[in-house]
């Protein structure tokens, strides 16, 4: 179908009635204060006008400088957005505010600055479809959000537009009372849609703006619901680090059998450096793991596990599901070996840092050994999902270094004494020889 035929078929006729987005929304906002309903829109500043003009210039337009069906379809294609011609035609009719059959810059500006259309885009009404086709009147907001997301506009224009809509969202929703007793929007704050991903990038931006102005109590509720909705993941970034914190064994420990506390105290008296971590957590023996790491091939620079996988991939050209399942354990083992090697190298670096800052003296000078726990916490590694150096490791390292230093100092002092005695003996001999000659 030619472009001229499309224009003739979907000619934008003047509207006899402007689509009303106000009546239903105002009825469905029981918590909105009267002062908010009577809120007068602020005039756009010159910099904001230029920012919206930059956004309008991105659209393909006809010879008169207005957005038509063909220009809107081309703009959507540039942004990778798919919409039928019928839906685009309806969106253009909704955007024709002055009913002149065209969407000019004035219409464009009135749509994007309208409070009710903005709410319809960022907070879809209950019972409406979440896609563009089932929720007409928000296409310009979605395109504007896409322009910001892809950085298709100048940096200054993006900053002005984002600041404008952030303030608009705060002003519009500041008077909403989100009580659970109200109907409609009052029930929407967390529970119904918390597990539903945002229907669009504009809604995602609105959610981010809403989180930024939440009170602490509401934020904790939001995070609790979010945790319930997220399925468990094998990613190391989804795991909570186990910090080396000591329990308060002097007070009452709820939910712990008394015999466990007695066992804990017994282990504490028996092995003061080894009781807590080995009792509560299955810590990895770094020396054993370091000995089990396979050496890197000097020619290729890779371990034998990775080279084995490489050979398996080269031998087979057509892979089946069974072949992929067979190679999966090899890949897992090679990945674990690689992560372990990285962790061990980082562990050596952290030990060198501890030696340079003289961490053992910090606890002695401050008369507090908590610095061992603090330093251990900051050696956490996601490669092995635990801290690379426990307080016990640091104390054993200090004992080893101090023992060697003491041995060296004793050896050096004894050698200095012998040298001093030798020099004294030589001086006495020379003095006696001079006296004999006299």
Curated annotation (Swiss-Prot):
UniProt keyword list: Calcium, Metal-binding, Phosphoprotein, Repeat
GO molecular function: calcium ion binding
Ligand binding (Ca(2+)): 96, 98, 100, 102, 107
Top-rank taxon: Eukaryota
Identification of the protein by name: EF-hand calcium-binding domain-containing protein 3
Domain called EF-hand: residue spans: 47-82, 83-118
Biased composition (Basic residues): 426-438
Species this protein is from: Bos taurus
InterPro entries: EF-hand-dom_pair, EF_Hand_1_Ca_BS, EF_hand_dom
Modified residues (Phosphotyrosine): 279
Region (Disordered): 413-438
Record SUPFAM superfamilies: EF-hand
């Amino acid at each position: 179908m030619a472009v001229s035929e499309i224009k003739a078929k979907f000619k934008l006729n003047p509207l006899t009635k402007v689509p009303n987005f106000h009546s239903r929304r105002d009825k469905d906002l029981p918590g909105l204060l009267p002062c908010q309903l009577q809120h007068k829109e602020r005039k756009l500043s010159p910099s904001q006008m230029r920012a919206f003009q930059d956004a309008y210039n991105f659209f393909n337009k006809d010879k008169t400088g207005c957005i038509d069906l063909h220009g809107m379809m081309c703009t959507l294609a540039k942004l990778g957005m798919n919409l039928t011609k019928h839906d685009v035609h309806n969106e253009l009719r909704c955007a024709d505010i002055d009913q002149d059959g065209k969407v000019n810059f004035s219409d464009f500006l009135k749509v994007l600055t309208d409070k009710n259309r903005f709410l319809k885009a960022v907070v879809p009404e209950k019972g409406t479809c979440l896609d563009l086709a089932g929720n007409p009147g928000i296409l310009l907001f979605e395109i504007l959000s896409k322009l910001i997301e892809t950085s298709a506009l100048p940096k200054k224009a993006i900053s002005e537009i984002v600041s404008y809509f952030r303030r608009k969202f705060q002003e519009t929703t500041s008077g909403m009372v989100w009580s659970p007793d109200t109907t409609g929007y009052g029930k929407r704050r967390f529970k119904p849609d918390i597990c539903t991903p945002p229907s669009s990038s504009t809604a995602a931006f609105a959610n981010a703006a809403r989180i930024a102005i939440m009170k602490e109590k509401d934020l904790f509720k939001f995070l609790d619901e979010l945790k319930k909705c997220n399925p468990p993941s094998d990613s190391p970034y989804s795991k909570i680090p186990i910090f080396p914190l000591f329990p308060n064994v002097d007070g009452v420990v709820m939910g712990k059998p008394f015999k466990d506390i007695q066992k804990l105290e017994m282990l504490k008296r028996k092995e003061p450096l080894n009781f807590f971590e080995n009792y509560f957590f299955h810590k990895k023996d770094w020396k054993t793991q370091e000995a089990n790491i396979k050496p890197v091939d000097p020619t290729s620079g890779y371990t034998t596990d990775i080279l084995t996988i490489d050979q398996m991939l080269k031998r087979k050209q057509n892979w089946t599901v069974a072949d992929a399942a067979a190679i999966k354990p090899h890949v897992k083992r090679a990945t674990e070996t690689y992560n372990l090697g990285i962790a061990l190298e980082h562990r050596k670096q952290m030990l060198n840092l501890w030696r340079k800052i003289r961490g053992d003296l910090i606890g002695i000078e401050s008369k507090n050994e908590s610095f061992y726990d603090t330093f251990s916490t900051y050696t956490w590694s996601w490669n092995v999902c635990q801290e690379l150096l426990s307080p016990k490791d640091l104390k054993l390292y200090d004992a080893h270094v101090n023992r060697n230093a003491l041995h060296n100092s004793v050896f050096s002092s004894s050698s200095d004494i012998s040298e001093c005695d030798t020099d004294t003996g030589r001086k006495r001999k020379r003095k006696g020889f001079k006296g004999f000659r006299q």
